[in-house]
Amino acid sequence: MTKLIIHLVSDSSVQTAKYAANSALAQFTSVKPKLYHWPMIRNLELLNEVLSKIEYKHGIVLYTIADQELRKTLTKFCYELKIPCISVIGKIIKEMSVFSGIEIEKEQNYNNYKFDKTYFDTLNAIDYAIRHDDGQMLNELSEADIILIGPSRTSKTPTSVFLAYNGLKAANIPYVYNCPFPDFIEKDIDQLVVGLVINPNRLIEIREARLNLLQINENKSYTDFNIVQKECLEVRKICDQRNWPVIDVSTRSIEETAALIMRIYYNRKNKYNK
């Protein structure tokens, strides 16, 4: 395996650079990457600390930095070391400007940063996801954008949180074998309801690992194949009867599941808004 060092430098959370790096790395099966994360680099003092690390561990640099002087310092430093220094969204911004004929606006001033509606919508969505996790506060489901249902340990909670980071309010409700399901499923609701299912054998592995972590040995039904299989089949049945989409998460990451849900949600929203 070829080792590859990548430095992710950002004035925010480095997530954009991280997604770009991982997408590119997926094309190289023989590479063993080592990613160094350098978030919240917003002044020269912090940047100089990062530069010393880059000098010690040479590697490709991917960056998302708004401040022009910091960008110049970083790119000049990498040029002198003869290592690649790539702006993740720089070319995109430039092409947008050229195509639209609109000049790039002034650099971000973090000291005067204004929290916009998107920021507060995201905070509200995260708060909603936390308060409506695992079937809590069902009386407020009408406020949700998306409702996830599925057996325990089918990634409902992390998917709800991921959706929240994208500004969507998501509630999740577990389905437990032989337990009555909330009566909301018998009503006409406007929210998008999505069922999450998984291969029963895979779900048993996940549940057994969970029980071992908690040092619980008594709950045999939780990992019984027949019961686990019935839970997944029943969720499919509930969704099929109501024309709700079902997503098999057996081989999907949280990001992939959330992306598919968002695609369904926005396609549905666009259809109804025509």
Swiss-Prot record:
Positions that bind ADP: G150, P151, S152, R153, T154, S155, K156, T157
InterPro entries linked: Kinase-pyrophosphorylase, PPDK_reg
Keywords in alphabetical order: Kinase, Nucleotide-binding, Serine/threonine-protein kinase, Transferase
Catalytic activity: N(tele)-phospho-L-histidyl/L-threonyl-[pyruvate, phosphate dikinase] + ADP = N(tele)-phospho-L-histidyl/O-phospho-L-threonyl-[pyruvate, phosphate dikinase] + AMP + H(+); N(tele)-phospho-L-histidyl/O-phospho-L-threonyl-[pyruvate, phosphate dikinase] + phosphate + H(+) = N(tele)-phospho-L-histidyl/L-threonyl-[pyruvate, phosphate dikinase] + diphosphate
Top-level taxon in the UniProt lineage: Bacteria
Enzyme Commission identifier(s): 2.7.11.32, 2.7.4.27
Pfam families recorded: Kinase-PPPase
GO MF term list: ADP binding; ATP binding; phosphotransferase activity, phosphate group as acceptor; protein serine/threonine kinase activity
Record's keyword annotation contains Transferase: yes
Keyword Transferase: yes
Residues annotated as transmembrane: none
Family per record: Belongs to the pyruvate, phosphate/water dikinase regulatory protein family. PDRP subfamily.
Cross-referenced HAMAP family: PDRP
Role played: Bifunctional serine/threonine kinase and phosphorylase involved in the regulation of the pyruvate, phosphate dikinase (PPDK) by catalyzing its phosphorylation/dephosphorylation.
This protein's name: Putative pyruvate, phosphate dikinase regulatory protein
Lineage, highest ranks first: Bacteria, Pseudomonadati, Pseudomonadota, Alphaproteobacteria, Rickettsiales
